[in-house]
Swiss-Prot record:
Functional summary from the UniProt entry: Binds and presumably selects ubiquitin-conjugates for destruction. Required for protein degradation and ubiquitin-proteasome system (UBS) function and regulates proteasomal subunit expression. Involvement in UBS might be cell type specific. Regulator of the autophagy-lysosome pathway that may confer resistance to autophagy by regulating the expression of autophagy-related proteins such as lgg-1, and by regulating lysosome formation, possibly by modulating elt-2 activity. Required for fertility, sperm production, and sex determination through regulation of tra-2 protein.
Boundaries of every UIM domain copy: 216-235, 273-292
Effect of disrupting the coding gene: Temperature-dependent increase in lifespan with a modest increase at 20 degrees Celsius and a 30% increase in mean lifespan at 25 degrees Celsius compared to wild-type animals. Reduced fertility with no sperm produced in the spermatheca, accumulation of a sex-determination protein tra-2 in the intestine, no embryos in the uterus, and an increase in the development time to adulthood as evidenced by an expansion of the proximal oocytes at a young adult stage. Reduced ubiquitin-proteasome system function (UBS), particularly in dorsorectal neurons.
Species the sequence originates in: Caenorhabditis elegans
Chief subcellular location: cytoplasm
Biased segments, Basic and acidic residues type: 337-346
Record protein name field: 26S proteasome non-ATPase regulatory subunit 4
Length: 346
């Protein structure tokens, strides 16, 4: 098995907010990054993967690591902003690979491009490609979201320069709008071993590989990742809502109060927001899980209330009235049980 260190360059420009890839370009790209991470780490237990974002100033989110959970956490912390600096991203990824711990590892860059290619000179790309080829650095370029023939031509030349006479090792993958990014990668050389086999089993189902993994092989991890992702999206939505005006907050409070006043059985799920649906489900769960012994507790409370109060002056009266005291003792459940036992013995 080939030992390889891979740096993944993520495009997190403002263009990643577009919804031509469901649910957005960024979230679709994050799922694809998880998929590539899974493939690389499963191909060889000694493989290492790193992640960097390219918006404005390039930022290395995770240096080369074998910890899958850490890489996924860093991946899903990426936010869209600014413009992408692809040239700087490639250079820094190359530099990070040169400082890999295992010098026997092959070096590879996986570059995601989903933004328009602006101010990128062909000569500069070719120069970088020649330097990477000299140092035996491979590169897979995944282009999605923007149908620019000029951009495709530039990076096609970039990949051809990297491959040289051998004609293999690096690849250019163009994913059309409206298709699944993860499904396209599953069918490409990015997620296949040297023998052409997929890095892990499972079909190209977009749902199964939404987090870059085969759900059947590791359902617990898949569920944990989905829950974590939904919690993060809910947190971001709550933070965005909190930044709204006071009027919006007041309106939400009125809606919540009105929802609380309506009986649970009469709630219209279609008319509620996601937050109200969660609150409704919580209230319903609390109602269903109410203690079943509550009526018995109330009955016992009524019995106690019916007994004479023992306190203050009433205590002296009770001690001076042995007949009343005996009556109270006889009424206790334990005393009744003893009487029944005595009758059975007789």
């Amino acid at each position: 098995m080939v030992q390889e260190s891979t740096m993944i360059c993520v495009d997190n420009s403002e263009y990643m907010r577009n919804g031509d890839f469901q649910p957005t370009r960024l979230q679709s790209q994050q799922d694809a990054v998880n998929l590539v991470t899974q493939c690389k780490l499963r191909a060889n237990p000694e493989n290492a993967v790193g992640i960097l974002s390219m918006a404005n100033s390039v930022q290395v989110l995770s240096s080369l690591s074998t910890e899958q959970g850490r890489l996924m956490m860093k991946n899903h912390s990426i936010e869209p902003f600014g413009k992408c600096n692809f040239i700087a991203g490639i250079k820094i990824a190359h530099l990070a690979l040169k400082h890999r711990q295992n010098r026997n590892h092959k070096m590879r860059v996986v570059l995601f491009i989903g933004s328009p290619l602006e101010e990128i000179e062909m000569n500069e790309l070719v120069k970088i490609a020649k330097k990477m080829k000299k140092e035996k650095v491979l590169c897979d370029v995944i282009m999605f979201g923007e149908n620019e023939s000029d951009g495709h031509e530039k990076f096609s030349t970039f990949v051809d320069t990297l491959n040289g006479k051998e004609g293999s090792g690096s690849s250019l993958i163009v994913v059309p709008q409206g298709s699944s990014l993860t499904d396209a990668l599953l069918q490409s050389s990015v997620c296949k071993n040297e023998d052409g086999q997929a890095a892990f089993g499972g079909g190209g189902n977009g749902m199964d590989n939404a987090f870059g993994m085969d759900v059947e092989n590791d359902p617990d991890l898949a569920l944990a990742l989905r829950v974590s992702m939904e919690e993060e999206r809910a947190r971001q939505a709550a933070a965005a809502a909190a930044n709204g005006g006071a009027a919006d907050s007041g309106a939400d409070a009125e809606v919540a109060a009105a929802a609380a006043a309506v009986p649970l059985e009469e709630m219209d799920m279609g008319a509620m927001t996601e937050e109200q649906q969660l609150e409704w489900a919580l209230r319903l769960s609390m109602q269903e899980n109410a203690p079943a012994e509550q009526p018995q507790v109330q009955h016992e409370q009524m019995d106690v209330d019916g007994a004479p109060a023992v306190g203050g002056d009433n205590l002296d009266d009770l001690m001076n009235n042995p007949e009343l005291l005996q009556q109270i003792v006889d009424d206790l459940p334990a005393a009744n049980a003893e009487k029944d036992d005595d009758k059975e013995k007789k």
